[in-house]
């Protein structure tokens, strides 16, 4: 039986760019403390001293309200802006500080200290690969189109609401992989075999599994008290689709306790697919 949340803690992700780096690292660390309820604040593009001072005001307000020090993850390059943030009543966890100095010492060259470089669009081919992959994922979502499956790097399959769409989008956005996804319906499962449109692309298929209890909860958000969201229906579909995975020799993964990031990384590992970007 899981423990209940113990208390709430304010967290700030601060950056002179998109804040994606600070947020990604911060969430990975915070996930190790499931009994703490975190109140997340994302502060991107903090590039001036004025903006930094405004953030300090917000941090201090949270400290007064919560009665404990907020946690601050930042990827600020400008030392003047960083010094201002460090005056806040908070626990400052500078993502770059320490790492940059160690790299500078090892590489024998000073850093550029250019702000916002992490996600700058500097390589047009890199950018195009990302955008093309995202467009492909959107155009080939949920079995809407199947005629371009020959161009897919990967085709995710699973029952309805098992995480196919968000995983497809993440793989395309983060790694530039062309991903289609196809839901196996009750009719497909009754046949106890892959639909014809998928059989010719068997080598590209990867299955998602999820525990019945979790699937019930997800489906109930859309259609509460329906047959679609009932435990018996979810259990029946999951047993049937796992049988297809096994009989057809399709690799699959139970994603119940996994984040999208974990799911995507495991899929790359299990399939041997190479990222096009990142």
UniProtKB/Swiss-Prot annotation:
Bifunctional serine/threonine kinase and phosphorylase involved in the regulation of the phosphoenolpyruvate synthase (PEPS) by catalyzing its phosphorylation/dephosphorylation. ADP binds at residues 158-165. Pfam families: Kinase-PPPase. Keywords: Kinase, Nucleotide-binding, Serine/threonine-protein kinase, Transferase. It comes from the Bacteria. This is Putative phosphoenolpyruvate synthase regulatory protein. Its EC number is 2.7.11.33, 2.7.4.28. InterPro entries: Kinase-pyrophosphorylase, PSRP. The lineage of its organism: Bacteria, Pseudomonadati, Pseudomonadota, Gammaproteobacteria, Moraxellales. GO terms for molecular function: ADP binding; ATP binding; phosphotransferase activity, phosphate group as acceptor; protein serine/threonine kinase activity. It catalyses: [pyruvate, water dikinase] + ADP = [pyruvate, water dikinase]-phosphate + AMP + H(+); [pyruvate, water dikinase]-phosphate + phosphate + H(+) = [pyruvate, water dikinase] + diphosphate. Belongs to the pyruvate, phosphate/water dikinase regulatory protein family. PSRP subfamily.
């Amino acid at each position: 039986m899981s423990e209940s949340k113990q208390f709430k803690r304010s967290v700030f992700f601060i950056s002179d760019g998109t804040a994606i780096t600070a947020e990604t690292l911060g969430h990975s660390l915070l996930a190790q403390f499931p009994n703490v309820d975190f109140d997340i604040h994302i502060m991107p593009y903090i590039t001036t001293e004025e903006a930094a001072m405004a953030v300090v005001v917000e941090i201090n307000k949270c400290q007064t309200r919560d009665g404990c020090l907020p946690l601050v993850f930042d990827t600020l390059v400008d030392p003047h802006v960083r010094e201002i943030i460090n005056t806040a009543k908070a626990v400052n966890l500078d993502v770059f500080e320490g790492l940059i100095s160690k790299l500078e010492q090892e590489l024998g060259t000073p850093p550029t200290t250019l702000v916002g470089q992490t996600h700058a669009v500097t390589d047009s081919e890199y950018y195009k690969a990302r955008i093309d992959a995202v467009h492909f994922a959107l155009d080939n979502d949920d079995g809407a189109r199947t005629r371009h499956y020959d161009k897919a790097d990967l085709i995710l399959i699973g029952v309805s609401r098992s995480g196919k769409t968000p995983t497809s989008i993440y793989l395309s956005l983060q790694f530039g992989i062309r991903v289609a996804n196809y839901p196996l319906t009750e009719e497909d499962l009754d046949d106890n075999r892959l639909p014809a449109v998928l059989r010719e692309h068997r080598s590209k298929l990867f299955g998602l599994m999820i525990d019945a209890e979790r699937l019930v909860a997800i489906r109930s958000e859309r259609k509460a008290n329906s047959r679609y969201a009932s435990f018996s229906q979810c259990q029946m579909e999951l047993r049937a689709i796992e049988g297809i995975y096994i009989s057809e020799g399709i690799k699959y993964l139970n994603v119940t306790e996994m984040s999208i990031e974990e799911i995507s990384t495991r899929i790359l590992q299990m399939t041997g697919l190479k990222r096009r970007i990142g």
